[in-house]
């Protein structure tokens, strides 16, 4: 029996609702498979923890997480806690502290979901966005001076290192190489940002020589939004900076129907530390407690987690079940359905148990 230790951090808003659904689905997969077991420990860190203790997680939080094989994360953010506190107090310390430098966000249109793009046919939108997750625009460098005065100044310093850009570029090329189309698009803004972004372009060209079977091209980030919208079929694997990929992946989720179906994996490719898996939809306090949160993104990121752990059959079984359920029209309101979180979760669990799934 293969056994794994998972740290669950439901955190804020709909996070507890979708993580509970994800754990239910993982249990269904365990029962169906019979050859692996997941041991889960749940941590109450997040905005409520902050209101009680003045921090989003305890000082030894990373030490507590090191013993786990993976981290299953819900969402962070609350209306009554500043966003920079919630983000820099929990999610980013985990990503940066564990050097989860590859943020991987697959996007495709699932069966039964009608995308907003009128002329987007089956298979036209099937992408993976690779986001540099350790530096760049979210390095945390900068400051403010002369606070409250007319001459107040605020600076945000983007930091790009050769080692950081090279490793994410190599990761993206390897991923593109493993996909059927072997196609990579490198996104920058190197016409206007003439230092770090030009270095990105140069390193992309250097790394490309290691992957002669991968076709690659370059796009400026503003033009990329147009290409994603009007010519989705021309894209496959995409790599971009921390900020650019953050924005583009939200657009990708919307083009696929909803952020409620968009997953992400924060990967330490060298496996020195646990990687973290989460939906990208955020805390969504406008629907918190209503029971209508879309759990599909959480199921998809659970599949990413299983694949990372080496349970490829279980990951494939989960995604097959998800696609059967969406194709049957069992959908939450954000993608045009009338089902609630529990109904979608139950349907996926039933599909996992069914004999017609892998």
Curated annotation (Swiss-Prot):
EC number: 1.1.1.93, 4.1.1.73, 1.1.1.83
Pathway: Carbohydrate acid metabolism; tartrate degradation; 2-hydroxy-3-oxosuccinate from L-tartrate: step 1/1; Carbohydrate acid metabolism; tartrate degradation; 2-hydroxy-3-oxosuccinate from meso-tartrate: step 1/1; Carbohydrate acid metabolism; tartrate degradation; D-glycerate from L-tartrate: step 1/1
PANTHER family, per the entry: D-MALATE DEHYDROGENASE [DECARBOXYLATING]
Physiological role: Has multiple catalytic activities. Apart from catalyzing the oxidation of (+)-tartrate to oxaloglycolate, also converts meso-tartrate to D-glycerate and catalyzes the oxidative decarboxylation of D-malate to pyruvate.
SUPFAM superfamilies with a match to the protein in the record: Isocitrate/Isopropylmalate dehydrogenase-like (SSF53659)
Species: Agrobacterium vitis (Rhizobium vitis)
UniProt entry tagged with the keyword Amino-acid biosynthesis: no
Cofactor comment text: Binds 1 Mg(2+) or Mn(2+) ion per subunit.
Taxonomic lineage: Bacteria, Pseudomonadati, Pseudomonadota, Alphaproteobacteria, Hyphomicrobiales
Record-linked InterPro entries: ICDH/IPMDH, IsoCit/isopropylmalate_DH_CS, IsoPropMal-DH-like_dom, TTC_DH
Induction: By tartrate.
Binding site for Mn(2+): 222, 246, 250
Catalytic activity reported: tartrate + NAD(+) = 2-hydroxy-3-oxosuccinate + NADH + H(+); (2R,3S)-tartrate + NAD(+) = 2-hydroxy-3-oxosuccinate + NADH + H(+); (2R,3R)-tartrate + NAD(+) = 2-hydroxy-3-oxosuccinate + NADH + H(+); (2R,3R)-tartrate + H(+) = (R)-glycerate + CO2
Subcellular location: Cytoplasm
Family recorded in the similarity comment: Belongs to the isocitrate and isopropylmalate dehydrogenases family.
Needed co-factor(s): Mg(2+); Mn(2+); K(+)
Name of the protein this chain belongs to: Probable tartrate dehydrogenase/decarboxylase TtuC'
Gene that specifies this protein: ttuC'
Keywords: Cytoplasm, Lyase, Manganese, Metal-binding, NAD, Oxidoreductase, Plasmid
Classification via Gene3D superfamilies: Isopropylmalate Dehydrogenase
Main location: cytoplasm
SMART domains referenced in this protein's UniProt entry, alphabetically: Iso_dh (SM01329)
Keyword Methyltransferase listed: no
GO cellular component: cytoplasm
GO molecular function: D-malate dehydrogenase (decarboxylating) (NAD+) activity; magnesium ion binding; NAD binding; tartrate decarboxylase activity; tartrate dehydrogenase activity
């Amino acid at each position: 029996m293969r056994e794994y230790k998972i740290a669950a951090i439901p955190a804020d808003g709909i996070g507890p609702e979708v993580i509970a659904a994800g754990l239910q689905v993982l249990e269904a997969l365990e029962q169906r498979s019979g050859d692996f077991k997941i041991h889960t420990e749940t941590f109450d860190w997040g905005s409520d923890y902050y209101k009680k203790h003045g921090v989003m997680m305890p000082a030894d939080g990373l030490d507590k997480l090191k013993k786990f094989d993976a981290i299953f994360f819900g969402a962070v953010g609350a209306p009554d806690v500043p966003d920079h506190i919630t983000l820099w107090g929990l999610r980013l310390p985990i990503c940066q502290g564990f050097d989860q430098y590859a943020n991987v966000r697959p996007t495709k249109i699932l069966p039964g979901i009608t995308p907003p793009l009128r002329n987007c046919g089956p298979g036209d939108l099937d992408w993976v966005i690779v986001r540099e997750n350790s530096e760049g625009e979210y390095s945390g460098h900068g400051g403010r001076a002369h606070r409250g005065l007319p001459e107040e100044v605020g600076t945000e310093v983007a930091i790009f290192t050769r080692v950081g850009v090279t490793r994410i570029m190599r990761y993206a090329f390897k991923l593109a190489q493993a996909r059927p189309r072997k196609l990579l698009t490198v996104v920058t803004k190197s016409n206007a940002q003439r230092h770090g972004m030009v270095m990105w372009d140069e390193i992309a060209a250097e790394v490309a020589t290691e992957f002669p079977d991968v076709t690659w091209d370059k796009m400026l980030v503003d033009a990329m939004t147009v290409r994603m919208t009007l010519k989705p079929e021309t894209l496959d694997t995409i790599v971009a900076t921390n900020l650019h990929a953050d924005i583009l992946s939200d657009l990708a989720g919307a083009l696929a129907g909803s952020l409620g179906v968009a997953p992400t994996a924060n990967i330490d490719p060298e496996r020195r530390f646990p990687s973290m898996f989460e939906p990208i939809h955020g805390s969504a306090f406008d629907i918190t407690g209503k029971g209508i949160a879309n759990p599909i993104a959480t199921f998809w990121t659970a599949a990413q987690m299983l694949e990372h752990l080496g349970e490829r059959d279980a990951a494939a079984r989960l995604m097959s079940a998800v696609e059967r359920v969406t194709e049957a029209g069992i959908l939450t309101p954000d993608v045009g359905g009338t089902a609630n979180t529990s109904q979608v979760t139950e349907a996926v669990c039933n599909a996992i148990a069914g004999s017609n799934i892998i």
